[in-house]
UniProtKB/Swiss-Prot annotation:
Protein name in UniProt: Proline--tRNA ligase
Function: Catalyzes the attachment of proline to tRNA(Pro) in a two-step reaction: proline is first activated by ATP to form Pro-AMP and then transferred to the acceptor end of tRNA(Pro).
Reactions catalysed according to its record: tRNA(Pro) + L-proline + ATP = L-prolyl-tRNA(Pro) + AMP + diphosphate
GO molecular function terms listed in the Swiss-Prot or TrEMBL record: ATP binding; catalytic activity, acting on a protein; proline-tRNA ligase activity; transferase activity
Assembly, per entry: Homodimer.
GO cellular component: aminoacyl-tRNA synthetase multienzyme complex; cytoplasm
Keyword Nucleotide-binding among UniProt keywords: yes
Keywords, in A-Z order: Aminoacyl-tRNA synthetase, ATP-binding, Cytoplasm, Ligase, Nucleotide-binding, Protein biosynthesis
Signal peptide (UniProt feature, chain positions): none
C-alpha cells in the first residue's frame, strides 16, 4: 500500500464491532500510534492536545482549592512499597521491577511506580512535625507503569499519564471532606467540560483501593453499554500514616497520626470522550475540550479574495474560539471528512458566493445541521453555538445512559437483563462480598458503585434474599 494512503477511510461501524470501531477511531483521527513496547502507546500531537486541555482545566481547579504541584521519583525501593501490606498485595501482580543498574545487580529491587502513595508517605513523615504543617495538599502530573495483560489505547496501557493528588490532614473530618470535594471536582469537570454525565458513589469493600478506608468513584456509561470508572478519590484515614509513622504534635502537644487522601484521573478520560460521543464518522469532541473548536474551509480558494477573507474571519474568531484555516491543496470534500473524523465541533465554509452575500456556511459536527450565518455575527454566534453544542451533547449522553439503566427485583430478572440489555442495572444488595462475587459469576457483572443518591427498590438482597443495605449500580466494565 502506498505510504501516501488516503487519510479518510471507512471506519468499522460501531454496531458491527465496537472494539474495532474504537481502534479505527484512535488511529485514523491520529490520536495515537502503537509503540515498539507491547501495551504502550505513542500519544500523537492531536491526542496530546486533548490531554493538555484536560490538564489545563483540572490544574486550575486544583490550585483554586489550595493544592500545589510536586514531582516524586519514578522508582520506589521494595522495602518502602512493603510498608503497607494491603497496598503492596493489591499492586503486586502489576509491578515492573528494576533489578540491574548498568552492569551491577542492585542490592534492593526498585519498583517502577504504579502509584505514589508510599513515596508521598515517606516524604510526609519527614516534613510534618506540627499541626502548623497541616494540611499538606500536593498533586503530581506524571506517568505510571502497570504490567497489564490486556491493553487498549487510553483505556488500559502498560504506561499511562495521570495526575495523583495526595493530601494529609489533622482530622478524620477534614480528610473525609477532601475526598468528597475532589470527587466533586472530577464530576463537575466531566459534566461541564467533557459533556459526560456521571454517577457518584462509593466502591464496595471488594472494589475499593488497596489500603484505603473508603473509595469513591464517578462511573460513566459508554455507547456499547459498558461502564467506565472515570475517576476515583480515596480516604485512607490513618491506615498509611500508622504504617509510615506520619505524626504531628497537636495544639495540646499530643502526638497524633495524620489522616490522608489520594485521588486521580488518567488518559482514560480520552477513551471516555471517544466512546460516549463518537459515531461512525469519527470523533465528536465536546467544544470545551476540543483542541480546535472551529475550522474554516475555503471553497474555490484559488479565486481572488477567498483566502484573504478566510484569514480575516480567522483573526476575528480567534478572539472567542480556537480556530484555524485549512488552506492546503486538498479538495474541500476531503477536508470535510478529515475534520469530521477529528471531531472539530464547528466547520465554516467560505467561497466567492458567500463573500458576495456576506455570509458563511456553518456546519455542526454533533447534528450535521447546516445554516447560513452573517459574517458580521460570527463573534457573538460562535460562543453561543459552542455552549449549545456542549449542552446538546451532554443531554444526548444523559438520555442514552438513562435509557440503558435498568432495575432488577429478582435474580432471574437480573441475569436476563445482564444477558440481553447492555447498560447499568440497579439492584439491592446485603453488603456481603459472597453475594457480590456470586453475581459476577452468574451474570458477568461487577459492582460499579453504591450511589450517593440511594433508592429502595425492594428491602431484600437480589442475590440471597436477606435484608438489603444498599442499592448498587452493576454492570460490565472496561
Amino acid at each position: 500500500m502506498s505510504k501516501k494512503k488516503k487519510f479518510v477511510e471507512a471506519i468499522t461501524p460501531m454496531d458491527e464491532d465496537f472494539a474495532k470501531w474504537y481502534t479505527d477511531i484512535v488511529k485514523k483521527a491520529e490520536l495515537v500510534d502503537y509503540a515498539s513496547v507491547k501495551g504502550c502507546m505513542i500519544i500523537r500531537p492531536y491526542g496530546y492536545a486533548i490531554w493538555e486541555n484536560i490538564q489545563k482545566y483540572l490544574d486550575t481547579k486544583f490550585k483554586e482549592t489550595g493544592h500545589e504541584n510536586v514531582y516524586m521519583p519514578m522508582f520506589i525501593p521494595e522495602s518502602l512499597l512493603q510498608k503497607e501490606k494491603d497496598h503492596v498485595e493489591g499492586f503486586a501482580p502489576e509491578v515492573a521491577w528494576v533489578t540491574q543498574g548498568g552492569n551491577d545487580t542492585l542490592a534492593e529491587r526498585l519498583c517502577v511506580r504504579p502509584t505514589s502513595e508510599t513515596l508521598f508517605c515517606d516524604h510526609y513523615a519527614k516534613i510534618i512535625q506540627s499541626h502548623n504543617d497541616l494540611p499538606k495538599k500536593y498533586n503530581q502530573w506524571c506517568s505510571v507503569v502497570r504490567w497489564e495483560k490486556t491493553t487498549r489505547p487510553f483505556l488500559r496501557t502498560t504506561e499511562f499519564l495521570w495526575q495523583e493528588g495526595h493530601t494529609a490532614h489533622a482530622t478524620a473530618e477534614e480528610s473525609a471532606k477532601e475526598t468528597i470535594d475532589m470527587l466533586n471536582v472530577y464530576a463537575n469537570f466531566c459534566e461541564n467540560v467533557l459533556a459526560i454525565p456521571v454517577i457518584k458513589g462509593q466502591k464496595t469493600e471488594k472494589e475499593k483501593f488497596a489500603g484505603a478506608k473508603a473509595t469513591y468513584t464517578i462511573e460513566s456509561l459508554m455507547h456499547d453499554g459498558k461502564a467506565l470508572q472515570s475517576g476515583t478519590s480515596h480516604n485512607f484515614g490513618d491506615n498509611f500514616s500508622k504504617a509510615f509513622n506520619i505524626q504531628y504534635n497537636d495544639k495540646n502537644s499530643q502526638l497524633q497520626y495524620v489522616h490522608q487522601t489520594s485521588w486521580g484521573v488518567t488518559t482514560r478520560l480520552i477513551g471516555a470522550i471517544i466512546m460516549v460521543h463518537g459515531d461512525d464518522s469519527g470523533l465528536k469532541l465536546p467544544p470545551r475540550i476540543a483542541p480546535l473548536q472551529v475550522v474554516i474551509v475555503p471553497i474555490a480558494q484559488h479565486k481572488e479574495g477567498v483566502l484573504d477573507k478566510a484569514e480575516e474571519l480567522r483573526q476575528r474568531i480567534a478572539k472567542v474560539a480556537r480556530v484555524k484555516v485549512d488552506s492546503s491543496d486538498k479538495m474541500p470534500g476531503w477536508k470535510f471528512n478529515e475534520y469530521e473524523m477529528k471531531g472539530v465541533p464547528v466547520r465554516l465554509e467560505v467561497g466567492p458566493k458567500d463573500i458576495e452575500n456576506n455570509q458563511v456556511v456553518l456546519v455542526r459536527r454533533d447534528t450535521r445541521e447546516k445554516i447560513f450565518v452573517s459574517m458580521d455575527e460570527l463573534e457573538t454566534k460562535i460562543p453561543e453555538l459552542l455552549d449549545e453544542i456542549h449542552n446538546s451533547m451532554l443531554e444526548h449522553a444523559r438520555t442514552h445512559r438513562d435509557e440503558h439503566t435498568y432495575t432488577a427485583k429478582t435474580l432471574d430478572e437480573f441475569k436476563e437483563i445482564a444477558d440481553t440489555k447492555p447498560g447499568f442495572i440497579k439492584a439491592m444488595w446485603c453488603g456481603d462480598t459472597a453475594c457480590e462475587e456470586k453475581l459476577k459469576e452468574v451474570a458477568g457483572v461487577s459492582s460499579r458503585c453504591m450511589p450517593f443518591e440511594q433508592e429502595e427498590i425492594t428491602d431484600k438482597c437480589i442475590c440471597c434474599g436477606k435484608e438489603a443495605k444498599h442499592m448498587v449500580y452493576w454492570g460490565k466494565a472496561y
